[in-house]
Each structure stands twice: as C-alpha cells, then as structure tokens.
A protein has these predicted regions:
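NAD(P)-dependent dehydrogenase/reductase Rossmann-like domain
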Residues: 1-52, 58-61, 70-176
C-alpha cells in the first residue's frame, strides 16, 4: 500500500512534541506491514498457535471457539466510534501542543469547521469538535468535553468486548 506521507509526518510531529498519537501512528505501521506480504504469510504459518482454556486458565493449542463473545455489528460500530473519538482527541491534542510550542495561537473550533467543509478529514462529526471548542476555547483535551466523555462511556463496554475478542482470537487491533 502506498503512502502520501501525511500520517508519517503527523507521527513524527507527535514524537517531536512528546504527544501520543497512537492511532495515526499505528495506521502508518499497518501500511508498512501491509507491504511485507511474503513475510507476513511466513510468520503466520510459524505462529498460528491457538488458545485453550484448561482449569480456567489459558494454555496453548486451544480452539478459538472457546472464546465466542458473540460480538454484534453494534459492538464493532461502537468500538470503531470510540477509536475515532480517541483519534480526533489525539490529533487536536497534538495541534494544541504544537500551537503552544510554536506560538501559533490556533483556533481549534475554526480548524474543525474548515476541515468539515472539505479537507482530508471531511466529517459531520467535526461539528461536535467545533462546538466543544466554542464552549471552551481553552479545552485541554476533547475527552474532557461532556459530549466526548459521554460517548466514550457509552461505547466502553462494547469497545472492551471487541478488543478482548480480537486478542483471544489472535487478531491484532492496535488502533482499537
């Protein structure tokens, strides 16, 4: 998979600012891994061990069906939504730290409004970010806004189920 470089640039900027930008950085890593197809196939054949529960504990060579949480589409939707919220919070945190570092005096509500009208990140969801920063221009992190806090709390149980099922099924979900 090709890259335009914006994710990589964002990840480097986050590291320069000592700011976690985990979801974007993991997306960059996923692209890099995607390009290593022959190595991924070989590794999968060498490390395809399954999990098993014996006496209430995990052991090797188990059947994955032991851990069937019966995830619903709604569980996955909620988990993706929570990850999206975290990604936006991390991105705006990076903007805030860079603005402080470089003396940019950025208006985050306006940035979200501009992006909503047509940029890399067009989304109706950006209106909620605009509203959060209109309410509190000095908002330290989007996760401290009432809307974002409530949405994370609502999504948290499904998010945990999806991540647990992924881990127990041998499916890496680093951006979750």
């Amino acid at each position: 998979a090709g890259q335009k470089g914006t994710g990589k640039w964002s990840a480097i900027a986050a590291m320069d600012e000592n700011d976690p930008l985990t979801l974007i950085t993991e997306a960059v890593y996923a692209r890099l891994l995607s390009a290593l197809y022959p190595e991924r196939i070989k590794a999968a054949s060498l490390y395809s061990g399954k999990l098993k529960v014996e006496s209430g504990k995990l052991s090797d060579n188990a059947q994955l069906s032991t851990f069937n949480f019966q995830l619903s589409i709604e569980d996955v939707r909620q988990a993706l939504y929570a990850a999206k919220l975290i990604s936006y919070a991390q991105g705006f945190s990076l903007l805030r730290h860079a603005s402080e570092h470089y003396g940019w005096d950025l208006d985050y509500g306006t940035i979200a409004r501009i992006w909503r009208k047509g940029c890399i990140i067009r989304s109706v969801f950006l209106q909620k970010i605009t509203e959060a920063y209109r309410k509190d221009p000095d908002l330290e992190n989007l996760l401290f806004d009432d809307f974002f806090h409530t949405k994370i709390q609502e999504a948290l149980p499904a998010w945990r189920r999806v991540v647990a099922e992924g881990a127990l099924s041998g499916v890496a979900l680093p951006a979750m």
